[in-house]
UniProtKB/Swiss-Prot annotation:
Catalytic activity: N-acetyl-L-glutamate + ATP = N-acetyl-L-glutamyl 5-phosphate + ADP
Protein name in the entry: Acetylglutamate kinase
Gene: argB
A Gene Ontology term for the protein's cellular component: cytoplasm
Annotated localization: Cytoplasm
Classification via InterPro entries: AceGlu_kinase-like_sf, AcgluKinase_fam, ArgB, Asp/Glu/Uridylate_kinase, Glu/AcGlu_kinase, NAGK-C
CDD domains linked to this entry: AAK_NAGK-C
Taxon lineage: Bacteria, Bacillati, Actinomycetota, Actinomycetes, Kitasatosporales
One of the protein's GO biological processes: arginine biosynthetic process via ornithine
Pfam families noted in UniProt: AA_kinase
Site residues (Transition state stabilizer), renumbered to this chain: 34, 252
Amino acid sequence: MSTARKHTALPKAQILIEALPWLTRHHGRTVVIKFGGNAMIDEELKAAFAQDVVFLRHAGLKPVVVHGGGPQISAQLDKQGLVSEFKAGLRVTTPEAMDVVRMVLAGQVQRELVGLLNQHGPLAVGLTGEDAHTITAVQHRPTIDGELVDIGRVGEITAIDTGAIQALLDDGRIPVVSSIARSADDHHVYNVNADTAAAALAAALNAETLMVLTDVEGLYEDWPNSDDVISRLTASQLEKLLPELSSGMVPKMQGCLHAVRNGVETARVIDGRVQHSILLEIFTDEGIGTMVVPDAPIDVHAARTAHEQGAS
């Protein structure tokens, strides 16, 4: 009987051993995860996400969660009879709408996420970009048809202070950050794109990895003509593709580009509709999304030698 039980358990042991190189590689490193898409509104996906993040923490990584809340914000605006309008892919945010954004992000979405994480122990602590000047912003004015357009309380990040987040990480906590920020100029509170905020925080924290959860499998090679996913590309390759991307993917991929060009080793866009997608991406060879890596460093000596040989 005991021998049979041992054999039954062997596959589990094999799975754990296969994860060993990845555990060794990522131990002690910071991972910034942008939580969004369908994973925010599906109860099973939310629970699986919380399990993944807590697993990372107990496996020796330092996860930081950044979230938005588009669907929840839209629902609350509709409930209060406030018109939700978009320009240049960004929500026009009046002062009244900003009150709703702030309430939903910090008072609803963040609280639910912190609660899910803390079902596994006293780990998660919620904060917003306002707290301890974590994120500072100015009003963002996009150019539409050649003219600057006022879209209200939409912010563009100008500074990141990682002190509060780093203190939480050092204490073994999981920071959960709502993507709103205060301006040092007019002291207004601004709605900041969560993809952009996650990328800026990843760079400022010198994170190993930025992970962005989406409602697609990754970056498609030739959408809509093909559903083949690009598994890996460099910063320069991504930069060339940006003008061709759909509007919803642009801030995500711009965030990935910013991250890997500012010290982050990898940025990954993964399918948040797949349960435990974070663990699959980090602890297996079979990554399930698109990984962006920095351009290879230029070998100055080799380039100079080649130039001299060509000149001779």
